[in-house]
Amino acid sequence: MILLWSCLLVAVVGILGTATPQPGNSSLHRLTRQLLQQYHKEVRPVYNWAEATTVYLDLCVHAVLDVDVQNQKLKTSMWYREVWNDEFLSWNSSLFDDIQEISLPLSAIWAPDIIINEFVDVERSPDLPYVYVNSSGTIRNHKPIQVVSACSLQTYAFPFDIQNCSLTFNSILHTVEDIDLGFLRNQEDIENDKRSFLNDSEWQLLSVTSTYHIRQSSAGDFAQIRFNVVIRRCPLAYVVSLLIPSIFLMLVDLGSFYLPPNCRARIVFKTNVLVGYTVFRVNMSDEVPRSAGCTSLIGVFFTVCMALLVLSLSKSILLIKFLYEERHSEQERPLMCLRGDSDANESRLYLRAPCAEDTESPVRQEHQVPSDTLKDFWFQLQSINNSLRTRDQVYQKEVEWLAILCHFDQLLFRIYLAVLGLYTVTLCSLWALWSRM
């Protein structure tokens, strides 16, 4: 009986021992210990040292975070993938409970020294310390990164500009005989992959072209893969806030030409338009990107619009000046004529008065007084008639001069309209041409 109980106790202990295996005896732990026990991460993982390790790269742009035109920097968020083969990290999966893939610390294995040549700031990406390794030794290192890279940003066609920024990947130390590069996906698939891009931002992703070439230098030949991120600015917000108000102000200035050229309110109106445009330009100056390399077309557009407004105001001022100078000179003439007639009449009466007193009798003088009064009255009527006639002539000349100014104003308006139309066509053509390049 005691023997029976002893056998039963041994069986229960054996069953419990097999039901709860120790962690050190698990297949995953045995596999990890076997792979890393004599692994040297300082050595490139190949059995034949003359054979190059090929690193396959892939890139997927997620968003454009910032475009710094003044400092010529582009900040993008992307998903970056590296795949290479480690000949020292392969195993027979049938010996380890059919384990096909495991995760290992990146710090414990060899990793290629791939960098981006256009880096200008510290890489901002989450720290992912693990990589996946399959039974054939293929290592997958996938991680999201934020890249701040140098880029030659051209703002000549703003806000219809297209930017082409390159990201060049290569090994910083190993030549092409040690580390070669390749594409993880087809190049056409990389170029047209826009599924994960955020289209609600200011920029629109057009394509991501990729090329492979070997850079030759004195230190050796290095394999390089270049990804060209082509993005286009969404111009609607800038068209609404910058271009349309400017166009409206120019149309209002064109409408002021329908006011009479002798109307003083025309100058006041044009002055208000010019002041309003100046205030608008100052308030919107921060919306236009500033680049030391070139002046954008929209900056030229603002400058030319202001120059046209100043030219329009100057033309109206000159027309008013010519009109009132002619009117002032014509108004002085009848006053001089009237003053000359009065002086002649006074001298005539003065010379006549002494002679009448010496030669005529008192009776005749009594009958001569009414006659002299009528003559004086007649002379006054003649003077008034001459003055009115002169005024009519002045008014007629003023009307004729005003008609000439009106025709001249219409001619200047047509020239102004032709210049504005030619400038608009030229600007639109340049915008269309540069937006396609």
From Swiss-Prot:
Q: Which residues lie on this side of the membrane: Extracellular?
A: 22-235, 285-295, 435-437
Q: One Pfam family for this entry, by name?
A: Neur_chan_LBD
Q: In which tissues is it expressed?
A: Expressed in peripheral neurons, but not in neurons of the central nervous system.
Q: How is it modified after translation?
A: N-glycosylation is required for membrane localization.
The cross-references to SUPFAM superfamilies, in alphabetical order and at most eight, read: Neurotransmitter-gated ion-channel transmembrane pore, Nicotinic receptor ligand binding domain-like
What subcellular locations does the record give? Postsynaptic cell membrane; Cell membrane
**Classification via CDD domains:** LGIC_TM_5-HT3
Q: What induces it?
A: By nerve growth factor.
Function (record text)? Forms serotonin (5-hydroxytryptamine/5-HT3)-activated cation-selective channel complexes, which when activated cause fast, depolarizing responses in neurons.
Entry-linked PANTHER family: NEUROTRANSMITTER GATED ION CHANNEL
State the protein's name: 5-hydroxytryptamine receptor 3B
**Gene designation:** Htr3b
